[in-house]
A protein has these predicted regions:
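C-terminal alpha-helical cap/extension of soluble enzyme domains
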Residues: 238-239, 250-322
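A short N-terminal beta->alpha junction/helix N-cap motif
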Residues: 1, 18-26, 50-54, 295, ...
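Residue-level recognition of the N-termini of beta-strands and the immediately preceding loop/turn
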Residues: 45, 77-79, 225
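Short catalytic-loop micro-motif centered on adjacent basic/acidic residues
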Residues: 20-24, 80-81, 103, 221-223, ...
Length: 322
């Protein structure tokens, strides 16, 4: 099997009431951990590359790592996606370089400017057999080079989605319903605290999601900033020398609810970073004399695999859907 687009993935997900996980990749261990979990659980998967990851690891290295994962896991569909492309030139480079899906994120621009840039990318992508994700509404938070300060985010306006999709021809739409990028998704002022002192985030705006679904029947919706920031990993990071106070994410039960609706793609990045970093910190604390990268990257890779398997089974619902 070769790399696929997300077209068939999303159709099956929409009809089946589940979502496909889109996991950000930066190196070999992350690619292996994600695809080993997806392969064993017979789940479709999207491997996505940000502008920052591309600068860090090099376009060619990342593409070849993903192609190797396809060879090693021929029984599952794998798509290679550009996350948060911010220019036509970046999207074009990825389209020309083997990606099967790209996102053009012009959500910070005016409505008309967003339409114009998205349409330009769509026309080029479709001519080359590549699908396009666009975005309406703006998420707060920090992830790679995507930075939006709290208070500057904006929910998607459902009354705009039909016109936007019709005029751009995009294949899926990322909307803003209260998710946020990074491990610090919400300020303390936005949350309450539970009995253990852990921040409890405000609920997602399912009313916005449901209105978008009503206006775009059968159309794939995407959620960005959907890491749950598992507290066991936050605790591990802090226990072994880290400092991540009040890191909090999106409750998994809310993501599971979204996946049963029209949300066909759920983006997860920070949870991978936390799983790896927590386990690497723990390893060095327990083995201060070790220096072989294979020694500490092996448990980090396993942590990624276990975390992705959990997401596939209990959040996305995509196990057995390859």
């Amino acid at each position: 099997m070769s790399l696929v687009t997300t077209t068939e993935m999303f159709k099956k997900a929409y009809d089946g009431g589940y979502a496909v996980g889109a996991f950000n990749v930066n190196n070999m261990e992350i690619v292996q951990g994600i695809t080993e979990a997806a392969g064993e659980l017979k789940s479709p998967v999207i491997l996505q590359v940000s502008k920052g990851a591309r600068a860090y690891a090099n376009h060619t290295y990342l593409v070849k790592l993903v192609e190797a994962a396809v060879i090693e896991n021929p029984e599952i569909p794998i798509a290679l996606h550009l996350d948060h492309g911010d220019t036509f030139e970046l999207c074009k480079s990825c389209i020309d370089g083997g990606f099967t899906s790209v996102m053009i994120d012009a959500s910070s621009k005016s409505f008309e400017e967003n339409i114009a840039l998205t349409k330009q990318v769509v026309e080029y992508a479709h001519d080359h057999g590549v699908v396009v994700e666009a975005e309406l509404g703006t998420l707060a938070g920090i992830e790679d080079e995507v930075v939006v300060e709290s208070g500057h985010e904006s929910y998607t306006r459902p009354e705009e989605v039909e016109e936007f999709v019709s005029r751009t021809g995009c294949d899926s739409l990322a909307i803003a319903i209260g998710t946020s990028h990074g491990a610090y998704k919400f300020t303390a002022a936005q949350c309450t605290r539970n009995a253990d002192g852990i921040l409890v985030p405000p609920p997602l705006r399912f009313d916005v999601l449901e209105e978008c679904i009503k206006r775009l029947p059968g159309f794939p919706i995407v959620l960005h900033g959907s890491s749950s920031v598992p507290q066991e990993f936050v605790k591990m990071v802090n226990e072994y020398g880290g400092n991540m106070p009040d890191a909090v994410g999106i409750p998994e039960e809310q993501l599971r609810k979204a996946a049963t609706l029209a949300v066909c793609k759920i983006n997860i990045d920070s949870d991978i970073r936390l799983a790896m970093t927590g386990n690497i910190r723990k390893y060095f604390a327990e083995h201060p004399d070790h220096f072989d990268p294979r020694q500490y990257l092996k448990p980090a890779r396993q942590a990624v695999k276990d975390m992705v398997a959990h997401k596939i089974k209990y959040v996305l619902g995509s196990d057995g859907k390859a």
